[in-house]
Amino acid sequence: MYLMVLGLLVAVIFLGLEVKGSRSWFEFGPVRFQPAEVSKITTSLLLATVMSQQSFKIDRLKDLMLVALVIGIPMMVILAESETGSALVYAGFIFVLYREGFSGWWLFAIGMAILLFILTLVTSAYTAILVLIGVVFFINALNEGKLNWELGANIAAFLLLCFLPWIMEKAAGPESFLEKVKPLYVLIGIALVSIPFFVIKGYKSHNRFLSLSSLGVVAGIMLVFSTDFIFNNIMQDHQRKRIEVLLGLKEDPAGVGYNVNQSMIAIGSGGVTGKGFLNGTQTTFGFVPEQSTDFIFCTVGEEWGFVGCLVVILLYVFMIWRIIADSERSREAFTRIYGYCVASCIFMHLFINIGMTIGLMPVIGIPLPLLSYGGSSLWAFTVLIFIFIALYRREKKYY
């Protein structure tokens, strides 16, 4: 089943219908079908099958690579369809891995990479690297769990780096070579000279955490310097524009930012209790595009206000909590892992969709589970959830 759906994902790139720059739909007369939605079901089932094997160990490289292939292959194919929203949902499977024993430091590393990427775009490479070094200092201090002269020296060195641009500006005279030296290069030089010292120190003192965090600084610096290349050469033009508008680097209220602006106006105008069913001006008169699909949450906000939005969010939270609670009560590893896959998919859709409608996430086109119009999404989530219900009920019957 997994391979069959994977074949459909590849086929739709060549044979599918292009809708708003994304080639991810098959069209059969009046009916459209999106294989990316069904792929969440097959990926969840195969992931649960692989990870529920008695011989599986999450910290073994061979098993970890197998899991990465199960998740990564459909994710990459969906990205090739220019369906970024659906591909991003697969990143949520990392929560499943975390539940099964995957190190939480990987979650932290992913979050840190996103933060560095944003800081480099919004501020400067110097600020991003400075934040990286500061975070590593702080984490190592917590890991040591005690105050000593080395910690004090590290704090003093970090404060010196914070004021390095100001110090260099004041020290530079009209004929000084400091005028031609950029603080960023000085910071990188200090970091690259210091890192081997900390790696060796960690190795000699059997402090593996110190060595790995020092190497993490190197990886972070490489990411910072790769940001411009990734942003300008790998990302597509519409993706760059959406990120620039989201981060406030550019204003485009009549273009890329139109959907989000109208969505936030609709939600804000709803007030506490909303304008009433079908009484919303922004949605009724069509100011908000895709209001029945990707931006359906703004319809809820305008017609039912803050109270309606809160009720909808709480219903989703209750559903996710109930799936996780039932997964934890399960005696079979397959049911538990599959349940976490279902919860992760729903959470990612909820987080991205609502974040998109209120301007906290870029517009990437992703439906709100069981609420947005669209047969593929509705059927996929229905089957996804009911498979879990069937698995859980079968266990209750036999145990």
Report residues per predicted region.
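Membrane-interface capping segments at transmembrane-helix boundaries
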Residues: 202-206, 391-399
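Transmembrane alpha-helices of multi-pass inner-membrane enzymes
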Residues: 135-138, 359-396
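Membrane-interacting alpha-helical segments
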Residues: 269, 333-340, 392-397
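Long extracytoplasmic/lumenal interhelical loops at the membrane interface
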Residues: 267, 271-304, 334
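Transmembrane helix boundary and interhelical junction motifs in multipass membrane proteins
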Residues: 83-88, 274-280, 291-293, 364, ...
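Alpha-helical membrane-protein architecture signal
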Residues: 69, 256-260, 273, 289, ...
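Hydrophobic alpha-helical transmembrane segments of multi-pass inner membrane proteins, especially
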Residues: 1-254, 298-358, 383, 387
